[in-house]
Each structure stands twice: as C-alpha cells, then as structure tokens.
Amino acid sequence: MGIRSDLNANFDYEIVDEFLDHYSMMIDSMEIMIIDLSKPNMYRRSVDELFRVFHNIKSASGFLKIEPMTRLASFVEEALEELRKRTKPVNENTVNWLLSVSDMFAQWLNDFKQDKELTHVKYSLLKLPDLE
C-alpha cells in the first residue's frame, strides 16, 4: 500500500483529491519562480510567491500527516523567510538548491500518482546553501 492508499484510508477522498490537485499546480509553477529569483525585476514577486507555496504545502501536508513533506516544506519556508529580507537576487547555488528541492517535491507527486511509498529526502537538501 502506497501513500495515496494510506491517505484515502485515513481521510475523505475529496480532501485527498483537492490536496493533490493543488499540490500538482504548485509543483508545476515552482521551477519558473525559482529561476526568476536570479532576476532583479522578478525577485520580490517570486520570493513572496514561493514562500506562499511552501507555506501552503507545509500546512496541507501537516493536516494530512505527511511528515517528510511537512518537515522539508518547513525547512524551505524558513530559508525563504530569510531571502524575503533581502532585496537582491539570489546566487546560483541557492537557485540550484531550490531546483533540487523542487525535484524532490515533484518526485513525491509521482509517488502519489503511482501509489508508492514516499521517496526518502535526499540528504543534500538538508544542507542549506550560502544564501548570500
């Protein structure tokens, strides 16, 4: 039994479907927002929107008790909170780290679709890059 079956067994089917619909849309929009963090004219809007995306993922996955997702989303949300205090675009290491984070969340979406166990978080994602 995979993650989708676990959720369907413990929560109303409509709640699970709504989560997956919204989660899928957030995953689809992440990459372009991350890349836009390196553009001066797009930085503020992108960092604020990414913060909102990870906050929403953290909240929804917390409600559904998807612990690895909640923990990683919280970790990224904290990093984005630091980035929100800045005015200049981020460096390449930060963009690459966030793209790797996005890949992890996309892998989890595939795990949901295929009703597999959630893929383990890559250790490298838990090492925050230099945000300067």
Label every model-predicted segment.
Residues 2-132:
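N-terminal assembly/transducer modules of large multi-domain enzymes
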